Amino acid sequence: MPKGAAGAGPRRHIAAGLQVGSYVKVADNSGAKEAMIIGVIGYKGRLRRIPPAAVGDMVVVTVKKGTPEMRKQVVRAIVIRQRRPYRRPDGTWIAFEDNAVVIVSPDGTPKGSEIRGPVAREAAERWPKVANIASIII
């Protein structure tokens, strides 16, 4: 991946709080309200192991609730919040109230123009285009 590309930032170990089959809230104004994770981009695991996802990961989701144009679409998204607590390098623990994603294009450009609620710092550092439209970064 070229230097400075989307998602090229360092991937720190974060406790995975989501997996394939998890329902997540869509936190942008793309028209989707709720989605289900059906894949994790870049995960190469063992046979029959359910792929885990954490804050900052790009996932493949199917839209379950939203506008008629968005429903039943298979799109990519970035995890911006997770309920499962994870530890930061400075020793603090952080957990959010919900599991949320932002719908993006395959190169990491957000489909919406605003993000509702906070965005984890780990996701903002890894995906600069998501950080640009975030209102709060925690």
From Swiss-Prot:
One Gene Ontology biological process: translation
InterPro entries given in the database record: Ribosomal_uL14, Ribosomal_uL14_arc, Ribosomal_uL14_CS, Ribosomal_uL14_sf
Gene Ontology molecular functions: large ribosomal subunit rRNA binding; structural constituent of ribosome
Any Gene Ontology CC annotation: cytosolic large ribosomal subunit
Functional description taken from the UniProt entry: Binds to 23S rRNA. Forms part of two intersubunit bridges in the 70S ribosome.
Subunit structure: Part of the 50S ribosomal subunit. Forms a cluster with proteins L3 and L24e, part of which may contact the 16S rRNA in 2 intersubunit bridges.
Name the record gives this protein: Large ribosomal subunit protein uL14
Originating species: Hyperthermus butylicus (strain DSM 5456 / JCM 9403 / PLM1-5)
